[in-house]
Structures are given as structure tokens and as C-alpha cells.
């Protein structure tokens, strides 16, 4: 078999559908190639051994992943689609071998998720693109925002795929997976994240210039003022490479996952070396944890969306899949004009469903707190409280 693939080598949509449908009933065994057959065939049996497919085939599979050729209604069908492509080209091997080989040339990792969608594949391509730009970002350039990047990569991927179909050359498609789109070409179309660069581990944030906005300052009594925030940040000891602002934002991101109540026990350490517990102690000297975090709410919101990391306890708190990014208790500050503004605004505004879900959750928690007033179950105590018209306690709210 000629290892150089052309357009005729790739299966059509109809052929893939037919192959997949039949594979779901009884997967056909791919044809054996000469190199697949062991020399010892004295008993007339043919045993299969793994042979690594050529780069051209792997690139073709990667191209189909990136371009959305295999959109994938579910993970099983997606697996069978890839297997069908290998069978069409005449190569054997189980799906795990295919995935390991594809990793070398296409998305890293090939998603081990129960559902695989084109948008998710594009998002991973975009994140890989951001990782490759880390060196440039450290020099002061800014990464594209997630939504704009996905849109740009999607358009570039589709254009490259259309061209590959015409020319029969699928090799350039793999560059979409590894390099994404030209940042200079799309720089005017993408948003900056508050003059920040974000590394792939999702924890390290570094301001590259102008750590606090110089524009007109709006203040709110529900969040810390810029002066208060700076006074707190001046107390944070950091390493030479990390600014106090970075540590402060990392603390706010941690609070989005752990909570910003005065009762929260903060775990973890900032990249500057200060523990979040110590930062929390500095914050409490000037304002509440929630007021401090609210100042960085918009930056935290952009960060959660960029890294596709909703607050970890969103399901526990009753949020739905569509409202999960609103599951942190200072979410209401995302729409507050007094919060630290990203340079080009939010990646996206909160949806009405997210706002409703957060407000409902806040209302339920406040009511539960107000009703949780029984310190004794004795008959005398409960009767006395009932006779007095109920226990009167201070009213609390999100501004605590």
C-alpha cells in the first residue's frame, strides 16, 4: 500500500456512516498487511502485531478531528469513526493504539470523555495554541480570549479543511491543531484579559503592565476600594518573579472554588509563596474576604471561562450545567461597575439564567441561615421561643 494518502484514500461521510453502523453491530476486522503478519505461519494461522501507521495517515485522522469531519454524537461512535478510517487505509490495531499515535500528531490529549463535540475539540486546539505562545506572552503580549480564539480557530480550521479537500493534501491541517491561528493577524479581533498572561496550569496569573487601572474609579460599599486592595497587597510577601497582584488574584480564584465566607478555611499556596490562609489573614485586617474577592470578580470570571473550570462545588450547590459558572458567592460583583475592569471587558456577560440561579441560591442560603437558630431541642426552650414570637437574630446578607 502506498503510504502517501490522497483525497481518494479518505472515506466519505456516507462510507463512514455505513462503516460505523456495521461496526456497532459487529466491528469488521481490518485487512492484514504484509508487515502485520508474523513470519511463523506454519499452522496456517495469521497473528496480528501492531504496525505504526505513517504520519500521513495520522495527520489525516488529526485533520478530521480538528475540522469536525467526525463530529461525534457519542464517544463510541467517534471511536468507530476513527477505526473505520484506519480500516479504509488498511491498517490494523485497537483504538487505544490509534489514540496513542494520534496524540503525537493531533490534539493532546485525545479527549477521554464520554461525549466529544467539535466545539470542545476546537477549544482544546485553542488552549494548545495558548501554551505555545507562553514565551511571547512573558514578553508582554496578551493571549486571545477563549470565545474569540475558538471562533478564529474554527474559521481557520474550516478554511484549511476546505482547501485540503480540493488539493488532496491534508498535511497543513495538523498545523491548525498545534499552532492555531496567527496571533498578529487576529490581534485586533480578540480581547485581552486585563493585561494578564495565563499559563496552561490554570493557576499562575501575571500582570504584565499597569497593575491597577488608571481610569476613573467607581467605588461600592459591597466591595473593597482600590486603595484598600493595594494596602492589602502591600502586606503580601512574594518571590522576585511574582507580583502581589498576581497572588491576590490567585487568592480570589481560590475563593471562587472554596468560598469567601469568614468561616472558610483557605487551603493552597500562591505562586509567590504566600499561603492563602496568610493572605486571608491580611485581608481580614482591612475588609471582609468577600469584599476583597468582589473587587477581582470580573478577572475571576474571565479566568473561569478561559480555562473552562467552573467552581468545583457547583453541582453540590444545586446549579445546573448551564449556570455552573455562576456558582461562586461573589458572582454578583461581575456586573458591578466598581469591580476591577478587564482592559477590553468581559469575555462574555453573565446570562439571565446564571444571574437567576445565583440569586436563588443566595436567597436560599440566607433564609437557611436565618432559620438555623435553635441552640437547644428542650421543650422548655422551644416553647419559650415560640411564645416570644421566634428568636430575633441579626440579619445577614452577602455583604458580610
UniProtKB/Swiss-Prot annotation:
Ranges annotated as biased composition (Acidic residues): 16-28
Cellular component aspect of the GO annotation: helical viral capsid
Q: Where is this region: Disordered?
A: 1-54
Compartment(s) of residence:
Virion
**Biased-composition ranges for Polar residues?**
1-10
The answer to whether UniProt assigns keyword S-adenosyl-L-methionine to this entry is no
- Disulphide bonds annotated for this chain are none
Major location (coarse):
virion
Superkingdom is Viruses
Any one GO molecular function term = structural molecule activity
Keywords of the record, alphabetical order, are:
Capsid protein, Helical capsid protein, Virion
Q: What does this protein do?
A: Required for genome encapsidation.
State the family it belongs to: Belongs to the potexvirus capsid protein family.
**In its UniProt entry, what is this protein called?**
Capsid protein
Q: Which lineage?
A: Viruses, Riboviria, Orthornavirae, Kitrinoviricota, Alsuviricetes
Amino acid at each position: 500500500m502506498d503510504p502517501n494518502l490522497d483525497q481518494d484514500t479518505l472515506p466519505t461521510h456516507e462510507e463512514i456512516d455505513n462503516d460505523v453502523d456495521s461496526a456497532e453491530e459487529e466491528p469488521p476486522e481490518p485487512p492484514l498487511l504484509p508487515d502485520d503478519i508474523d513470519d511463523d505461519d506454519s499452522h496456517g494461522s495469521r497473528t496480528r502485531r501492531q504496525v505504526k501507521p505513517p504520519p500521513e495517515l495520522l495527520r489525516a485522522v488529526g485533520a478530521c478531528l480538528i475540522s469536525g469531519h467526525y463530529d461525534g454524537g457519542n464517544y463510541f461512535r467517534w471511536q468507530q469513526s476513527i477505526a473505520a478510517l484506519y480500516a479504509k487505509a488498511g491498517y490494523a490495531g485497537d483504538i487505544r493504539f490509534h489514540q496513542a499515535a494520534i496524540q503525537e500528531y493531533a490534539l493532546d490529549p485525545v479527549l477521554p470523555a464520554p461525549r466529544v463535540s467539535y466545539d470542545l475539540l476546537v477549544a482544546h486546539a485553542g488552549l494548545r495554541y495558548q501554551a505555545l505562545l507562553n514565551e511571547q506572552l512573558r514578553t508582554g503580549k496578551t493571549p486571545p480570549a477563549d470565545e474569540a480564539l475558538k471562533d478564529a480557530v474554527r474559521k481557520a480550521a474550516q478554511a484549511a479543511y476546505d482547501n485540503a479537500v480540493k488539493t488532496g493534501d491534508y498535511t497543513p491541517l495538523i498545523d491548525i491543531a498545534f499552532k492555531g491561528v496567527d496571533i498578529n493577524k487576529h490581534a485586533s479581533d480578540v480581547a485581552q484579559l486585563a493585561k494578564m498572561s495565563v499559563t496552561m496550569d490554570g493557576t499562575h496569573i501575571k500582570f504584565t503592565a499597569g497593575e491597577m487601572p488608571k481610569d476613573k474609579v467607581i467605588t461600592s460599599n459591597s466591595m473593597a476600594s482600590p486603595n484598600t486592595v493595594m494596602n492589602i497587597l502591600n502586606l503580601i510577601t512574594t518571590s522576585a518573579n511574582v507580583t502581589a497582584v498576581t497572588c491576590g488574584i490567585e487568592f480570589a480564584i481560590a475563593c471562587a472554588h472554596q468560598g469567601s465566607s469568614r468561616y472558610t478555611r483557605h487551603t493552597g499556596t500562591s505562586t509567590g509563596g504566600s499561603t492563602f490562609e496568610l493572605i486571608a489573614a491580611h485581608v481580614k485586617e482591612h475588609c471582609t474576604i468577600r469584599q476583597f474577592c468582589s473587587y477581582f470578580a470580573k478577572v475571576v470570571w474571565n479566568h473561569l471561562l478561559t480555562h473552562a473550570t467552573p467552581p468545583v462545588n457547583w453541582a453540590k450547590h444545586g446549579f445546573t450545567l448551564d449556570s455552573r459558572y455562576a456558582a461562586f458567592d461573589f458572582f454578583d460583583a461581575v456586573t458591578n461597575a466598581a469591580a476591577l475592569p478587564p482592559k477590553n471587558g468581559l469575555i462574555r456577560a453573565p446570562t439571565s439564567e446564571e444571574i437567576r440561579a445565583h440569586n436563588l441560591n443566595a436567597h436560599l442560603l440566607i433564609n437557611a441561615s436565618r432559620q438555623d437558630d435553635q441552640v437547644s431541642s428542650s421543650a422548655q426552650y422551644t416553647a419559650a421561643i415560640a411564645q416570644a414570637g421566634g428568636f430575633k437574630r441579626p440579619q445577614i446578607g452577602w455583604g458580610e
